[in-house]
């Protein structure tokens, strides 16, 4: 509403101001559209935490329009079974990725190639059976890795190379039977390791990993449980409680197998020796060198009863020695106290007994005076 008596100049000024305000409002709206990225369909986005939540939507593919500035991407509880190598391309700012509770059976080698700032990776409860050794080489800042509840039977050597910042690793509920110590050597910052609910075979193949576990526990690392499944004598027993002498046979077995392959030079051994040629009539057959392969000794697990018996015998011997030392010390103390008491009583009796030689000299002096 114009004030009464306003002229055309005042009207034109008001119209001009109104146009300026409209232009400024439109410009702000356009800037807001450019700054705030579009959110993928059916997903929930938080512009403050830069989190995109696409969990529980029944997705079979990763949404292609995830904003490049996303720092947290949640894709758990979906139906993802196969992912292309470019599924997370251009998401270099991503720090947290959750792919739990899906149907993934394998991961392309370069699927995490652009995730250089990734610090947390959740792959729990999938169907992953194998992992490429270079899968995590482009994520050196990774701190938390969860591979539990999958079908992993082994870990490729070099899988954890370069993961110096990794603090927690979960390998629970897989099909792991043994682990290589060299695979875990690069994990200098590891604080928590979960390996429970795996069919561990506590034999020679797990000896070196047991050494690494002792070092890991010594520097303050936490381990849930590593219960043996085989051999049956150790079933249910924690690997850390198995005495090291149970693995003494492993070194002997390796030495015997190595020496079997370093015998005197001769023809190469074969599994089935060829039939000797038929001798000529009237000629004596010449003995031929044996080409049979020496049979390697199979690993025979040391009896748990024998190991426990050795420990018990050693404890009994040590106990007897300690008891003998205590008895000897007590006997010495008693003997010393008795001797001290005897000397005290002897000193008390000496003034009462008198000196017979002194009395004899006194009698001589008296007789000479008389």
UniProtKB/Swiss-Prot annotation:
Residues 36-306 are extracellular. Residues 1-35 form the signal peptide. The keyword Transmembrane helix applies. Keywords: Glycoprotein, Leucine-rich repeat, Membrane, Repeat, Signal, Transmembrane, Transmembrane helix. It is a single-pass type I membrane protein. Glycans are attached at residues 90, 117, 125, 257. Residues 260-297, 351-370 are annotated as: Disordered. Pfam families: LRR_8, LRRNT. Residues 328-370 are cytoplasmic. Disulfide bonds: none annotated. Gene3D superfamilies: Ribonuclease Inhibitor. InterPro entries: Cys-rich_flank_reg_C, Leu-rich_rpt, Leu-rich_rpt_typical-subtyp, LRR_dom_sf, LRR_TM_domain-containing, LRRNT. GO terms for biological process: positive regulation of synapse assembly. GO terms for cellular component: membrane. Residues 198-252 form the LRRCT domain. It is found in: Membrane. LRR repeats lie at residues 69-90, 93-114, 117-138, 141-162, 165-186. The chain crosses the membrane at residues 307-327. The keyword Transmembrane helix applies. Residues 36-68 form the LRRNT domain. This is Leucine-rich repeat and transmembrane domain-containing protein 2.
